[in-house]
């Protein structure tokens, strides 16, 4: 496909309107301050911030741990099934408006069960929103259960046991929270059990952790997809492996800058990842906290990196479909939609028009 006819000034519209998938979104991280206050009022929870603006002002993170502290505090307003539904439904509506056609959504059950919230309350609310999204929005979505790596292996096994009666409502498991002091090998046995159960496997690695964490996630956890993974470029052998085996990375540019993984978007390595042949994707991570949903991650990144153009936009969107955990026929259908989107652009003589 020839992308030379697409001028840079048209990129913003193309990035916002092209069909795409989101593969790295923590649903608790989509909890906007307005909804936090609404749920706090509904559930009679006293927040430490008297106004929405003061809560927003508290989103001044210096590293991953300082973010996680307020992230878990915000999740405390989630008490009932309706709360989890409302949170997920708000995200799905936003995703639909941004031309996301498929989302694979992380959720952290241990954050909630530790507060005495039953697992079924969490997953039933999320699942109800996903089913409504399919019916009313035509948006495909699925759930991935994430284990909190700062907790013990025993806690992870307990979370898995809680989840098994609801096995039909999630497609896989992941590993999130702080990498420091919590290497992948801590959860080797948990992931082995999940693999036996036929669950899809992903893991956060190489965000604040080293390239070795990525290798260990692949070798020990048998992860099929790496979340973040930006430190892979520190290891040329790992890069070659990622390219050869087509192991996708779910990269989150605005998150990386907010958490000081990179000093600025102009210093981000997403362009280098693509140039190396890695199946990188762009995602929002925790959009309510990091200043942008999926389209903002695309547009801000492309604005900051002049080397990225229409070819990279197409490749990132295509990678997002190819890296998703759906059957090949569905993937091929989405890729045809993407091809038609760019073909439609060319047929209109270089003028961007929506399909």
UniProtKB/Swiss-Prot annotation:
One of its GO terms (molecular function) is adenine deaminase activity. The record marks 228 as: Important for catalytic activity. Keywords: Hydrolase, Metal-binding, Nucleotide metabolism, Zinc. Binds 1 zinc ion per subunit. The keyword Transmembrane does not apply. It catalyses: adenine + H2O + H(+) = hypoxanthine + NH4(+). Catalyzes the hydrolytic deamination of adenine to hypoxanthine. Plays an important role in the purine salvage pathway and in nitrogen catabolism. This is Adenine deaminase. The lineage of its organism: Bacteria, Pseudomonadati, Thermodesulfobacteriota, Desulfuromonadia, Geobacterales.
């Amino acid at each position: 496909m020839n992308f030379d006819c697409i001028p840079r000034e048209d990129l913003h519209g193309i990035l916002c309107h092209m069909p795409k998938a989101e593969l790295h979104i923590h649903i608790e991280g989509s909890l906007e301050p307005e909804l936090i206050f609404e749920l706090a009022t509904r559930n009679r929870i006293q927040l430490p911030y008297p106004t929405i603006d003061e809560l927003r002002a508290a989103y001044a993170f210096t590293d991953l741990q300082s973010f996680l502290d307020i992230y878990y505090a915000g999740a405390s307003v989630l008490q009932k099934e309706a709360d989890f539904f409302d949170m997920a439904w708000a995200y799905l509506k936003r995703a639909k408006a941004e031309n996301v056609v498929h989302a694979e959504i992380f959720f952290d059950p241990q954050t909630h069960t530790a507060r005495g919230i039953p697992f079924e309350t969490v997953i039933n609310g999320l699942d109800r929103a996903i089913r409504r999204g399919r019916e009313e929005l035509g948006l495909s979505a699925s759930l991935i259960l994430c284990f909190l790596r700062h907790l013990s292996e025993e806690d992870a096994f307990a979370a898995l046991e809680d989840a098994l009666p609801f096995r039909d409502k999630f497609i896989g498991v992941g590993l999130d929270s702080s990498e420091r002091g919590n290497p992948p090998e801590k959860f080797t046995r948990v992931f082995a059990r999940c693999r036996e159960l036929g669950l899809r496997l992903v893991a956060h690695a190489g965000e604040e952790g080293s390239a070795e964490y990525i290798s260990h996630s692949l070798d020990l956890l048998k992860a099929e997809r790496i979340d973040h993974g930006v430190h892979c470029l520190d290891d040329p052998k790992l890069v070659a492996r990622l390219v050869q085996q087509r192991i996708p990375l779910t990269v989150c540019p605005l998150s990386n800058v907010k958490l000081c993984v990179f000093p600025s978007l102009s210093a981000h390595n997403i362009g280098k990842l693509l140039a190396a042949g890695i199946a990188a994707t762009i995602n929002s991570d925790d959009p309510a906290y990091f200043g942008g949903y999926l389209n903002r991650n695309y547009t801000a990144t492309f604005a900051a990196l002049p080397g990225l153009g229409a070819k990279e936009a197409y490749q990132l969107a295509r990678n997002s479909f190819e890296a998703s955990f759906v059957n090949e026929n569905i993937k091929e259908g989405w890729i045809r939609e993407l091809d038609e989107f760019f073909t439609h652009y060319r047929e209109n003589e270089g003028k961007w028009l929506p399909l």
